[in-house]
């Protein structure tokens, strides 16, 4: 209601956003003439000037217009690219800490240079987050000339970098990297033994590219660093043998919507007989029930060449959202081991958590967060509720010309694919490029075989062609190119009509060639620069005229070649535009409307023509699982002949309703995961706070003295309750003191005359404890003691935290059972988790106090100076683990270093990565 009133009075949100942005863009444009007149040296010195203004009290908002105008001019001089006004809007929105929704081809990477540069001026660092290493490196190198011209340093994090290389990258003003690398480096930084071994600085400002992919699609995959658990793998083989003997409908039912398998009462008895156990649900068999459940899912819910593939003796997960092979990623909770048993490959061991965090809680650490994507508006509610991010829709620079045609629905999958082939044949006849989106490797290969049988040449882009991904996508706009891609594989690489304009890459290399040939003549360099400008603006005749003035023969030949390539590309580009642009075929609807919109958005970039159509069948997963019975009955009633499609608003509405239901369900899962992780997050913040204080200060004597007071107080309350000294358990208190190495004997009679006996005994015991502590310090020496104290504290803290994480994992796995007792699992998890954490803190204090007071140091220990940082060592293995409604996640399963993740369809998937090189 409030939104309706707001719209009536002040216009739609989109209109209100534009009203805020337009005046700032006008101010930016007012600087253009002045800045354009600056020579390179003056323009480059703008950074120094801006930093001085910030130091004098101005804010980033104050200098935004001039800073943005500066970046625009530098980008034009270094890259030959000038920011459009709509890109300025996108940049302002990002600086404000919003999500800028910009359609495919609108130049998000160039747009990001504006807020990246502005926020780098604070000196606190900017993190630019991408979905993979290739894009991180590509974008950093692409935009590097802009930043380096302005004397701003750029670093890139790559998966195989060692510790020192990472440190250098993070100390740069701007750091590009993937969400996984940023997250894992954060966890590793909270596991180091010396502050010098940390790689990250503070978390100041992050811009997340493809923000919907990272903050929505991957939000169910916590980052986990784990170590191996001691557990046999035989049980997986034992359970796997009995699954083929169970009968669907009698022993179990399959719930495709929930991606679950439910064991019937008859099935329970059958399993008991096969496994030779008396009672499957006896306490000692709870783990066995879990393994049976996971084995059933492995056989009945997860399918080879759809959910995973088997390569080189390994089960490798196929990413649900991109169709890529996720090498090293593992399903969690024993599901991956069950799949390994099913496929007859070696079974890896399970593991336990050493450190973990969800993407939701990692990215909420940043002081300011922003994101870019072509499709965010459908998830605006989730971005606001979870991340407090507003979505601002940025207008396109040119009007979108793409025609989105109605869906065509067929009764069977065979009829649907026949129709897809006919559509492709029709486009092939006029050499119009086609991109076909499929939801799995299996479907892409079925369609590929069908096209080959009709003699249609094409490229297939799925996990098996991962290495050629960018090349295939870049050339998907060539005349007559037919490309089949799983989901959104290749996202981040624009499909340019006419194919990739490679001549632009060669053009960029001209400067380097001139340098290598020693060309320094100013007049000749200006001619080459003019040639470059003409080519960028596609003024080919003028460019040809410039070539004749080039004196160096090597450069002249290179210019002739580049011009020839540019002309050929222009012919292809114009031909494809005349043929109707890129045609998109969706071979199935995805669960999320956003993923469908991403596929459509590959066509019609920057005002180009294009078209799209989805082909569906009643056998598609979305239609089959979420209710296509009514549509099927109508098709039967109408006696529709084979091959006849159905186009009706009722069909479109049914699909939209199904997608909204699934989106709502997935949002609930992500929200639920966050509610569970918030419990751990509060605990994590407390432990990491103590840890960082320990590393940064080194001297923990004040904290230790606080621990003394709390531990002594607890012991006094335990053994000396109330002020009646005769009722005290004074012998127990003395035994505790003796266990610490304090021989002083306390007598209850000494306190009877005190007005507050309990307070007095606390003071006496506290004094005894601190005297022993002071004696230890003085006898060993302050410097050596501080080092010992720090190491003892750190060692105990890390061990207790690791044990606590293990216990919390088990609590999470078993908490669902309280639902049968009509209790709320989340509330029970919070209550029990708080009690366990409270116990952890008490144990930590007791153990630190006890260890420090009992410690004995030899002469050789005194001679060792342990204050200098040791060599950096990486601990544990990295994982990504998706979770179920109760947040159950991890259990990666290799003893060697790795990374993991899940689909909350029951198991979790885990993604592995190698250790940092030493």
From Swiss-Prot:
Subcellular location: Cell inner membrane; Cytoplasm
GO molecular function terms attached to this record: ATP binding; protein-exporting ATPase activity
Pfam families: P-loop_SecA, SecA_DEAD, SecA_PP_bind, SecA_SW
Membrane topology: Peripheral membrane protein
Enzyme Commission number(s): 7.4.2.8
UniProt-listed SUPFAM superfamilies: Helical scaffold and wing domains of SecA, P-loop containing nucleoside triphosphate hydrolases, Pre-protein crosslinking domain of SecA
Record: residues binding ATP: 87, 105-109, 494
Biased composition (Basic and acidic residues): 863-883
Keyword Secreted among UniProt keywords: no
Tree of life domain: Bacteria
Spans annotated as Disordered: 863-918
Catalytic activity: ATP + H2O + cellular proteinSide 1 = ADP + phosphate + cellular proteinSide 2
Keyword line: ATP-binding, Cell inner membrane, Cell membrane, Cytoplasm, Membrane, Nucleotide-binding, Protein transport, Translocase, Translocation, Transport
Family matches, as HAMAP family: SecA
NCBIfam families for this protein: PRK12904.1, secA
Subunit structure: Monomer and homodimer. Part of the essential Sec protein translocation apparatus which comprises SecA, SecYEG and auxiliary proteins SecDF. Other proteins may also be involved.
Name of the molecule in the record: Protein translocase subunit SecA
Gene: secA
């Amino acid at each position: 209601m409030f939104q309706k009133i707001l719209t009536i009075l002040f216009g739609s949100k989109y209109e209100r956003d534009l009203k805020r942005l337009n005046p700032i863009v006008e101010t930016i444009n007012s600087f253009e003439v002045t800045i354009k007149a600056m020579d390179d040296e003056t323009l480059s010195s703008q950074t120094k000037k801006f930093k001085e203004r910030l130091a004098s009290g101005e804010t980033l908002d104050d200098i935004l217009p001039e800073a943005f105008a500066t970046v625009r001019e530098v980008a034009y001089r270094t890259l030959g690219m000038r920011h459009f006004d709509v890109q300025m809007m996108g940049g302002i929105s990002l600086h404000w800490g919003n999500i800028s929704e910009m359609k495919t081809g609108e130049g998000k990477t160039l747009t990001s240079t504006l807020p990246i540069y502005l926020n780098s001026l604070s000196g606190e660092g900017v993190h630019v987050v991408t979905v993979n290493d290739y894009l991180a490196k590509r974008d950093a190198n692409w935009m590097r000339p802009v930043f380096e011209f302005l004397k701003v340093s750029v670093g890139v994090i790559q998966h195989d970098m060692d510790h020192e290389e990472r440190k250098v990258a993070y100390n740069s003003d701007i750091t590009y990297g993937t969400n996984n690398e940023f997250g894992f480096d954060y966890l590793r930084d909270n596991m180091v033994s010396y502050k010098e071994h940390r790689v990250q600085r503070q978390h100041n400002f992050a811009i997340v590219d493809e923000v919907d992919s990272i903050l929505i699609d991957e939000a169910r995959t916590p980052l986990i660093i784990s170590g191996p658990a001691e557990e046999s793998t035989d049980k997986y083989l034992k359970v796997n043998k009995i699954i083929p003997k169970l009968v669907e409908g009698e022993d179990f039912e399959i719930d495709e919507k929930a991606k679950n398998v439910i064991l019937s009462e008859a099935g329970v008895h059958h399993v008991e007989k096969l496994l030779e156990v008396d009672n499957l649900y006896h306490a000692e068999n709870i783990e066995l029930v879990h393994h049976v459940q996971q084995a059933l899912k492995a056989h009945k819910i997860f399918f080879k060449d759809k959910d995973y593939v088997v390569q080189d003796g390994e089960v490798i997960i196929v990413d649900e959202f991109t169709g890529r092979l996720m090498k090293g990623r593992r399903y969690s909770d024993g599901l991956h081991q069950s799949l390994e048993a099913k496929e007859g490959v070696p079974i890896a061991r399970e593991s336990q958590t050493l450190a973990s965090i969800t993407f939701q809680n990692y990215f909420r650490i940043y002081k300011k967060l922003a994101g870019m994507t072509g499709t965010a508006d459908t998830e605006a509610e989730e971005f606001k509720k979870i991340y407090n991010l507003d979505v601002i829709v940025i207008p396109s620079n040119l009007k979108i010309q793409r025609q989105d045609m109605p869906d065509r629905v067929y009764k069977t999958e065979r009829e649907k694919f026949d129709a897809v082939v006919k559509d492709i044949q029709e486009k092939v006849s006029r050499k119009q490029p086609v991109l076909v989106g499929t939801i799995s490797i299996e479907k892409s290969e079925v369609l590929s075989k069908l096209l080959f049988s009709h003699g249609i040449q094409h490229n297939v882009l799925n996990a098996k062609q991962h290495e050629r991904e960018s090349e295939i996508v870049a050339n998907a706009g060539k005349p007559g190119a037919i490309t089949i891609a799983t989901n959104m594989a290749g996202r981040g690489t624009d499909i340019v009509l006419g194919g990739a304009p490679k001549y632009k890459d060669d053009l960029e290399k001209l400067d380097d060639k001139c340098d290598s040939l020693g060309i320094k003549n100013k007049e000749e360099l200006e001619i080459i620069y003019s040639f470059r400008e003409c080519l960028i603006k596609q003024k080919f005749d003028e460019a040809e005229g410039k070539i004749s003035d080039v004196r160096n023969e090597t450069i002249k030949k290179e210019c002739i070649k580049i011009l020839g390539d540019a002309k050929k590309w222009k012919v292809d580009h114009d031909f494809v535009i005349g043929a109707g642009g890129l045609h998109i075929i969706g071979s199935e609807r995805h669960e999320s409307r956003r993923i469908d919109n991403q596929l459509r958005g590959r066509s019609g970039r920057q005002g180009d023509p294009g078209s799209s159509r989805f082909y569906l069948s009643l056998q598609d997963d979305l239609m089959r699982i979420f209710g296509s019975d009514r549509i099927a009955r109508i098709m039967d009633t109408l006696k529709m002949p084979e091959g006849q499609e159905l186009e009706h608003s009722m069909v479109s509405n049914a699909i939209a309703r199904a997608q909204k239901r699934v989106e709502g369900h997935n949002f609930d899962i992500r929200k639920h995961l966050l509610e569970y992780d918030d419990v751990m997050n509060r605990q994590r913040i407390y432990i990491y706070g103590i840890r960082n204080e320990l590393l940064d200060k080194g001297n923990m004597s004040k904290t230790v003295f606080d621990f003394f007071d709390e531990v002594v107080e607890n012991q006094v309350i335990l053994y000396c309750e109330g002020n009646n000294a005769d009722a005290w358990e004074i012998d127990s208190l003395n035994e505790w003191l003796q266990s610490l190495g304090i021989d002083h004997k306390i007598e209850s009679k000494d306190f009877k005359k005190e007005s507050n006996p309990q307070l007095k005994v606390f003071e006496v015991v506290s004094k005894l404890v601190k005297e022993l502590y002071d004696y230890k310090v003085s006898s060993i020496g302050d410097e050596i003691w501080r080092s010992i104290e720090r190491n003892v504290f750190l060692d105990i803290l890390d061990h207790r935290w690791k044990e606590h994480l293990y216990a919390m994992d088990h609590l999470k796995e078993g908490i669902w059972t309280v639902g049968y007792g009509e209790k709320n699992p989340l509330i029970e998890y919070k209550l029990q988790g708080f009690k366990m954490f409270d116990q952890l803190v008490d144990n930590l204090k007791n153990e630190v106090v006890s260890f420090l007071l009992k410690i004995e140091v030899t002469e050789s220990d005194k001679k060792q100076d342990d204050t200098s940082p040791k060599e950096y060592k990486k601990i544990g293995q990295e994982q990504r683990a998706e979770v179920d409604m109760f947040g159950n996640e991890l259990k990666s399963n290799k003893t060697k270093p790795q990374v993991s993740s899940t689909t909350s369809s029951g198991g979790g998937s885990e993604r592995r990565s190698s250790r940092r090189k030493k």
